[in-house]
Every structure is written in structure tokens, then in C-alpha cells.
Amino acid sequence: MTYSELKTLAGFKAKKESGKFAYHLRKLLRQSLIAQNRAERKYMLTALGRLVLNSAKQIEEQALLESGRLFVRSSKHKMEEFTTDRIIHSLVTEAGMPVELAQRVASEAESRIYKFQTAYLTAPLIRELVNSILIEEGLEEYRHKLSRLGMPVYDVTEEFDKVGEGGFGIEALVNETANSVLSEYLLLVQLPHDIVDSHLSGDIHLSDVGNWSLRPDIVFATVDNETKVMKQIEGKFLFVPRWNILNKPLMKLAAINYLLSREVRKELYYHGFSNVVPVDVDEKDVVEIFNILTYTSVQNNNLPRITLEVDAKSNNLLNILNGYKEYVKATPFPMLGLAIIDASKIQEDLFDILTEISKNNGVISLNKDSKTMKSFYGFSAELTGKVGPMILGSVSLNMPRIALDAQSDEVYFRARTRLQMQNAVNALKIRKKLIENNIKKGLLPFISTFDDVVLKDYSLLRVNMTGLSEALALVNSTDSAEKIVTETVESINEYFKTVAEDGHSDFALTLTSDDSASRFIQLDRDKFGRSKIKNIALERYSQGILLNHDDIANKSKISYTKKLVELINGGVDVKLVLDTKDERKENKDIFKALSLFDYFSLISLLKICSRCGRKQQGNVSRCQFCNGGLISNYS
């Protein structure tokens, strides 16, 4: 370090002390404890200096032990002398313990600490000791409140190695370590034990536990020429320029996307996108729009999907589709997708473009309704005035588990489903309050500020059913699957009417995809045995509805799918798989699906190379271009 830095750190701050400091500095130089780098005008420790410093530290620590005084390395990044007052203060303020009891526990902790004869005493070690005393004394309720959240050193070290392989960099490492703490906080503090036990046992599943209590899953945001972003910004987002972008709708959209994508967990749906794209826009400009939206989205492993609503009647539809086609060709895993509303108006000569987009891993959904919005994951929502709502879901029921517990009894299956639904509903009620508090506290500043973009006072609460088809196969009944589903869902819908106690939320079922499918099957293998589960499913339970070329011609499959869509009010994720390798057949499948369903999305089963990013079809195990590992776009 420099002369002035060294002087300040040594405590010689006044000018009149400069001579005294220079005297001591010369002494250290003569004894070869420090050396001077004349070129950089800096001083550094020599090898002898380090040896002397380490020896001095050891002597100091031993002297502390001999004197009976102990110093604690606290979580405030300071060395503090050990005193029982800090333990008493923590027990009283954090755990709510009576003072006399806290003094007794602190005294016991002190006697044990002095028996340790350790020179390296830390705050976490003292807390662990106090918690062990509380357990021994049967004071479990206080121990629970005194728990310390965090990760073991080994796990943090492993995270450094693992996160780098994902390609998201240092932000992903920070997110993963933060998620670990927030997950523990949710399960230990914010949720009651019965809901936590249901999640841990596999009866229900809470997705992305680290973010579950922080952010909404899906936000339906309105963006049009009347959205007044900068007029409401006031003292928030001080790092954002205060330009007047009222007449620059695409710049306005980029600003909204930059701020809002940080506050949404799963998907951000922009209603009215095609209305703000100029009619005379060309394909190159459309590609630039998609690039800007990609670059202004939060870039880490929590990146939400961006869905842009496009009206099939728009004069710029062709250019938007062609621009999106070029965008997905250049992007291995596009996080931007198009939701085409009023899709029955699409001209058939555009089906070729839709197919090509899907073959390049693009995300296209077709919605014949122009008033009901449908997200990429199949969630339904309607505008309230001009503003869209938030969706809070991420709670899934393990339907095969319910069927296995019912042991082929149809009546018990329905009753058990309704019983598990109570836990799911209670979890969502708590989540709604937690996120509302986050909005009030300013933790979600965009959502709390911009009332003409997001409806913050009204939430759609959604419970997902995972493995419904496997569950129906397990229920031994003379009734058809359609009848069992009808009676079960109608019973749940009636129950939902009784629990929507206020006018600011509503409950509904969904059939969508999340991370519960693989977790449920693993937990069920542990509970019921691998051989029993093997006959039900292999790697994951079914989610949503997948339709291929053969299914489109299957009347019973179509009838069953239509019934599910009719019954399940929250939305059904219907996906049409383009897998025939015959473009004419696939175009006919799209046309037929449009005549059968009000909503579906298009997918093609692809594999993307993790090394070169190229896309390839077919049953291949390694990249055909560079022999790299492959990632499936849909699993």
C-alpha cells in the first residue's frame, strides 16, 4: 500500500505525527520486515514480516487464553470481547424469552464456552451451543426462533463449481446462495408446520421455494400509447433517465421490460404489443425490437419468459412473424414468445412461417379469443379495465399420490383431493399476504408504482394438478375417466367458492407444467417402492396436455381434452407437437387444432448443443457438428 494509506491505517492521522510515523517506518525497513517498491511507490510485507506477524497473532491468542478473556468474531465483521449480555439480549429480543430464563441459559453457555479452551470463537458457534442447551432443556419453541439461516461451507464451495457450468455467471451464484437462505426462512418462519410437512412429504409442491414468497409468478402487463411510465416514476429508479418517451412506445416498452422483468418469477405477458409496433415496420426493425427486449431483461438463471401479444388482424402481422423467425434462428433458447390473439383470423398461407418458427425452437401460441389472455404456460386472465392482473400459483397437487393412498376407492379419491386442496389454498392465502406486504414495503417498486401497467390489488390464485392422467388410471372405477374428472373438479370448484372470502382474489385449478413432475415421482418411489411407480410413469408425471398428429384425429382424446378445458377455469396448457417432418401435414394439424380448441401452443421436440448452440432434431445423443452434449428443449 502507499505511504499515506499505511500512515492512516497505523493510526497516525494528524500532520504533527508524520515524523513519529517516519521514524517507525524506517525501523521496519531496517529490520527487513517491510520492503519498498520504488517504481510503484508502495510498501509490502516481506516473508520475514509475515512470519513475525503470524507469530504475534499466535502469541496474542495464547495470551487471551491465559488471561481468561475471550474474543468473538461476530457477524458484524468485528472482534468483540465475549460477554453473556449479548446472549441474553438475543434470547430476549429474538426468541421472546423471559429475562430470568435467558440469564440461566446464558450462564450455562458461558461455563461451557470456557471449557472449550478455543482461541477461535465465532458468533455461529455460540448460537449453535445455545440452541443445543435449549433442546436439552426442552425449550424447543425458543430454539426455533433462534435458528440461524445459511449454507454449510462445503455447499458454498460446491456452488462455485456447479454454477459456472450453467453459463449464467456470478449473478447465478449470488441468486443460488440467497435462495438457500430464503428457502429456509420460508419453511422455518413464514409457513405453518402442516403446509411445510405436506411440501416436504410430497403431497403438495411449492415451486422455486427461494422466490416463492418474494415475487408473483406471472404478470399480465398493459403497454399501449397511453401508458404514462415516466410521469409516475417520481423518486424511484434514480438510475433511469427521465426522458419524455410518451410518444416513443417501443422505448417505453424497453423501459418497462428493464424494470418489471426483475419483479416477476416465471412469465411477463405484454398485452397490446402489436398496437405499439409501427404499421410500416420492416423485418430488420422487428428483429432489433426482440434483441432490445432480450438485452433489457434480467440476465440470470431467474429470467422470466417474455410473451408478446400480437393481434391476428394487425397489418404488421407478417413482418412481426418474419422478424421473429429470424430472431429465433439466431437464438438457441429464446425466452421471448408470441401470443397471437383472434387466431381464427390468421391466413393459411402464414402457417408455413408458424411451422418454421416452431422448428427453430420459437414459442408461438394461438388464442381464438381476443378478450381472454393466455400465457405461455396456459394460465387464463382478463383485463380489469385496461390493466391485467398478477397470477400467484406455484402450488401443485400430487394426484398419483392421492390415487395410491385411495387404493382404487373413487369416493375416497375425491375426498382426499379436496382435503389436500385445503393445504394448497392455505398456502396460497399466505403467499398472497406475503407478496402484498412486499409491494407495500417497496420491495417490488415497479408493481407498487405503475397502476396503469399492472393491477396490484387483484391476484388470481391457482393450484396445479400434476399427474392427473396417471391418477385416473389408478382409480379402479366402472365410470369413465371423463366422469371421474368432472365430479372431482366440480367438487373442488364448489369448494373454491367458499374460500374466496374477499373480492380481491379468486381460486381456480390449472393444468400446467412446472418442476413438480420429477420431484413427485422421486418421492413416490421412496414411499411406495420403485416397482410400483415404474408401472405408472418412468421419469416424471404428466403435466398439461400434449397432442401430436395422431391425437388430432382421435375423437375420444379430443373430447376428453375439450372437457378438461371446459372444467378447469384457471387454464390448461395444451401443446400441439409438430413431429411429422411433413410440412403440409403439420399445417393441416394447425388448421384442425384451430377448429377444435380455443387455445394451444406449438412445439417441436429439439435438442440444443450446450457447446456450440446448434439445434437438431431426431433421436441423437451427441451434437452432430461438434460432438458436444445436448439439452432437450422440452422434457
Locate predicted features.
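Short acidic, hydrophobic short linear motifs in intrinsically disordered regions
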Residues: 2-12
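DNA-binding alpha-helical recognition surfaces that contact promoter or target DNA
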Residues: 8, 23, 128
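Short amphipathic alpha-helical interaction segments
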Residues: 14-30
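A short, conserved structural fragment
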Residues: 29-39, 501-507
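Short, cationic-aromatic polyanion-contact patches
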Residues: 39-60
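Charged, amphipathic alpha-helical regulatory modules used
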Residues: 61-168, 455
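Conserved catalytic cores of very large enzyme subunits
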Residues: 163-457, 478, 482, 486-633
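Conserved phosphate/anionic-ligand binding catalytic regions in large, soluble enzymes, centered on
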Residues: 455-472, 631-635
